[in-house]
Amino acid sequence: MGLPRRAGDAAELRKSLKPLLEKRRRARINQSLSQLKGLILPLLGRENSNCSKLEKADVLEMTVRFLQELPASSWPTAAPLPCDSYREGYSACVARLARVLPACRVLEPAVSARLLEHLWRRAASATLDGGRAGDSSGPSAPAPAPASAPEPASAPVPSPPSPPCGPGLWRPW
């Protein structure tokens, strides 16, 4: 079967493929209904052997009934926004750093405490102002800093990049 040379050939080709496509579509529907029956019967407490002759409509009705009876809390929730994901990742990273940094003794304790205080403050400001952790022109909220954190010195620590709120959020991992 090459490319049709005339309009009549194309029509013939469509005519011959139509039953084949319909057969495949019906096979997919039947396979999906069979899988659905296999999934829904155990959840309803019925045995597969007793219900082998269920009609397609029965399987669909049982599925609809089962889904209607599910509590609303078990329904899947919407995916988090990229901004929320960024904030959660940033906070988790700072929390991990707060556990590791004092133990590895790479920095002096005062510098380490100042760095952690700054990072916690940035995480809190990103949460409070809806994800924009840009310039801190206003007062920031108290940050959950370590208990032994000394007062910050005058040397500023670079701030993390502000979380982008968009579909093209790039992640290094």
From Swiss-Prot:
Q: Where in the cell is it found?
A: Nucleus
Q: Where is the bHLH domain?
A: 13-70
Compositional bias annotation for Pro residues: 141-166
What InterPro entries has UniProt attached to this entry?
A: bHLH_dom (IPR011598), HES_HEY (IPR050370), HLH_DNA-bd_sf (IPR036638), Orange_dom (IPR003650)
Orange domain location is: 86-119
Organism annotation: Homo sapiens (Human)
Q: Name one GO molecular function term.
A: protein dimerization activity
Intervals of motif WRPW motif: 170-173
Q: What is this protein called?
A: Transcription factor HES-2
The reply to whether Repressor figures as a keyword in the UniProt entry is: yes
What domain notes does the record hold? Has a particular type of basic domain (presence of a helix-interrupting proline) that binds to the N-box (CACNAG), rather than the canonical E-box (CANNTG).
List GO BP terms, alphabetically. Answer: regulation of neurogenesis
Write out the function statement from the record: Transcriptional repressor of genes that require a bHLH protein for their transcription.
According to the UniProt record, where is the region Disordered?
A: 128-173
Q: Which Gene3D superfamilies match?
A: Helix-loop-helix DNA-binding domain
The cross-references to PANTHER family, in alphabetical order and at most eight, read: BASIC HELIX-LOOP-HELIX TRANSCRIPTION FACTOR, HES-RELATED
Give the quaternary structure: Transcription repression requires formation of a complex with a corepressor protein of the Groucho/TLE family.
Its main subcellular localisation, reduced to a broad class, is: nucleus
Gene field: HES2
Where expressed (tissues)? Answer: Expressed in placenta, pancreatic cancer, colon cancer with RER, cervical cancer, and in head and neck tumors.
| Keywords noted in UniProt | DNA-binding, Nucleus, Repressor, Transcription, Transcription regulation
Instruction: State any GO CC term.
Output: chromatin
